[in-house]
Amino acid sequence: MAMSFEWPWQYRFPPFFTLQPNVDTRQKQLAAWCSLVLTFCRLHKQSSMTVMEAQESPLFNNVKLQRKLPVESIQVVLEELRKKGNLEWLDKNKSSFLIMWRRPEEWGKLIYQWVSKSGQNNSVFTLYELTNGEDTEDEEFHGLDEATLLRALQALQQEHKAEIITVSDGRGVKFF
């Protein structure tokens, strides 16, 4: 089921691609950028990217307007997402990142709801089965990347609802 994406009105407004100097205006602008990034990545199920890929992506590059958010401004938007818990840098140079349109705790809650709803408590799953198995095809976490899945399962492990284990063909998880 593909969701359609509608660009927000700001995306068609050239000044949106220049961070504004006024503090209040800039805060609203950053909030709009953060919302756009999360919505775009959620729709495209995109969870990791480099800053250079981001700059060339339609997300920060409006070809029709011939406007592109500069790399320094993209870094500011990404840092704002990090402060909100929606982004994690994958390297110390801050050139690649994991984008989390849902925080790990939220993914964990969704996964655990499915486990409980489908009577799978006390069951063991491989990570592959959980995100790529037939049983989860209709779930939002189907197709979730392994890095985000592990963070979600670690959140569940802290709540004593799951335990990440080693199984014959890699890692797995047991739900309680």
Swiss-Prot record:
The lineage of its organism: Eukaryota, Metazoa, Chordata, Craniata, Vertebrata. This is Vacuolar protein-sorting-associated protein 25. Component of a complex at least composed of ELL, SNF8/EAP30, VPS25/EAP20 and VPS36/EAP45. Component of the ESCRT-II complex (endosomal sorting complex required for transport II), composed of SNF8, VPS36 and 2 copies of VPS25. Interacts with CFTR; the interaction requires misfolded CFTR. Interacts with the ESCRT-III subunit CHMP6 (via N-terminal half). It comes from the Eukaryota. It comes from Bos taurus. The gene is VPS25. GO terms for biological process: protein transport to vacuole involved in ubiquitin-dependent protein catabolic process via the multivesicular body sorting pathway. It is found in: Cytoplasm; Endosome membrane; Nucleus. The keyword Membrane applies. Keywords: Cytoplasm, Endosome, Membrane, Nucleus, Protein transport, Transcription, Transcription regulation, Transport. PANTHER family: VACUOLAR PROTEIN SORTING-ASSOCIATED PROTEIN VPS25, VACUOLAR PROTEIN-SORTING-ASSOCIATED PROTEIN 25. Belongs to the VPS25 family. Gene3D superfamilies: Winged helix' DNA-binding domain. Chain C. Domain 1 (1.10.10.570), Winged helix-like DNA-binding domain superfamily/Winged helix DNA-binding domain (1.10.10.10). GO terms for molecular function: protein homodimerization activity; structural molecule activity. Pfam families: ESCRT-II (PF05871). GO terms for cellular component: ESCRT II complex; nucleus.
